Amino acid sequence: MHIFSKEHRFHGGHGIVGGQIPLGAGMAFGDKYHGSDAVTLCYMGDGAVRQGSLHETLNLAMLWKLPVVFIVENNGYAMGTSVERTANHTDIWKLGLGYEMPCGPIDGMDPVKVAEGISEAINRARKGDGPTFLEAKTYRYRGHSMSDAQHYRTKDEVNEYRKIDPITQVREHILKSEYATEEELGSIDTDVKNRVQECADFAESSPYPEKSVMYDAVYEQSDYPFLAHKL
């Protein structure tokens, strides 16, 4: 939610559930208005699709043929409630049918199929054919937070999904396609673990920030009125 990179046009998530959905359509509107061939990928979870803003956005996105791909990461439980308990039907992708929007499911546990499905939707948008609504059926192994006791599922269920873990599938695909060897993958794995550990060590050894930096990188304008009353 809090990962953001303006340089890479990655605009993060939103503190309000589903709040990013109309913003994503707005970005797509801006790109179309300026004649850009950019396509917006707007991600959301299975919990966010119960927000009314989704339907308002799908309607306008289809009406204006906006270059946006809506991608639902359906892990089956949102924060901790099964999708069967929140919807009359569990095929979330069918929500697109009500707006005559191209839509469909993709295997969210298979990165290759995800890439293929999204690439097809991007090409459709760039041709001027408007938005696509995709549901990536996936899974998460851990609770929504540290306080999540996960009473809503069994350990056997989690273990079954671990057998088709996306990272394992990518690794097998790389080896089968001879893009890399076991040794090269092992080296990459070690390098990544070392870099992550370095970041963790740096964070844990760093002092707490001063109160004076509380508002840094919050507002674009350095003279924003609210800043005159900051602590």
Identify the residue ranges that each predicted region occupies.
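Cofactor-binding active-site loop characterized by glycine-rich and histidine/acidic residues
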Residues: 1-64, 82-88, 93, 98-100
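Acidic, glycine-rich active-site loops and adjacent beta-strand->loop/helix elements
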Residues: 7, 44-50, 72-78, 109-112, ...
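Conserved thiamine diphosphate
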Residues: 32-36, 88-120, 163-189
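Structural motif
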Residues: 39-44, 69-71, 133-135
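Glycine-rich, charged/polar anion/phosphate-binding loops
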Residues: 54-57, 116-123
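A short, conserved beta-to-alpha structural element at the edge of catalytic cores
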Residues: 64-84
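Short beta-alpha connecting loops at secondary-structure transitions
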Residues: 76-81, 101-106, 151-159, 184-185
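Glycine/aspartate-rich loop-and-adjacent alpha/beta segment that forms the canonical ThDP
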Residues: 124-231
